[in-house]
Amino acid sequence: MELFDSSANIPIQRIQFPEIKDGPSFFIKRLDLIHPIYGGNKIFKLKYHIAKVQNEKIQAILSFGGPFSNHLYALAGLCQKLGIPCYGIVRGFEPYKENPNLQFCIKAGMQIFFLSPQYFNSALERNKIIEEIQKEIGPIHIIPEGGTDEMGILGASEMLSDNELNFDYYCIGVGSGGSISGLIRKTNGKGRVLGFSALKNGQYLEESINSYTKNYPKSWKLFHDYHFGGFAKQNKTLKDFERTFEANNDLEIDPVYQSKMLFGLEDLTKKHYFSIKDKVLIIHTGGLQAKNGFEYMAKK
């Protein structure tokens, strides 16, 4: 597919939950097929940031994330393709650069700076790094962690095309709140948007989503019961579910967001949350390289 091509060209696949015999019709929009590195929701959230950099001839891009950040991974790959210098400020310590996620970022040309968790959110510490870079190369474009801001949400609203606004529910995993905010804006009350937080104690996300969608109908709900202990946490139940789902539907899902969302959807269906007549569209947000991160950590 062409870079930043219309989301109307992306396949929608029917899926099944093995334990559900009588339930709604489930479909998944395969954003993961756009590209193995910067596909999924990431390319949409980065679209207008990239456009700004290219149109205004800004020298480079800088963003933030954890050592296994999907966002930094996608940004590094996209900047490599487009020939844009990029920088990442990473929450953690120097030894983290050996993990497969950051190894890819470094090989793709991203220059990495580490800030300890204690100082990662410090504007003072971040600005020290940013000022040093700008002294050397001039103005840079800064993207917030996860790519969630007005430009990111505008791009995320394009994950759905106009002719896909005929579903009863739209479902997505939630980390920073940008992608679900884009869905809420796009659907604009046509169907309900269901988000599944991948974070423990992620209730604060509701305030953020509300602020981004205050001019749109409150036709959404964020579930907090399927985080499995917190961000990037798994247990045997979730791992078994992931393997069974992948085998039954001939597609891969990521272990951070989609496995939890899909587990939640199956559980809600068992609890009769949906009508048998409902049509449910799930957004596949990519991020499959997270499997490598889990394998890496399992060996540590």
Which role does the model predict for each range below?
Residues M1-K300:
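PLP-dependent amino-acid enzyme catalytic core
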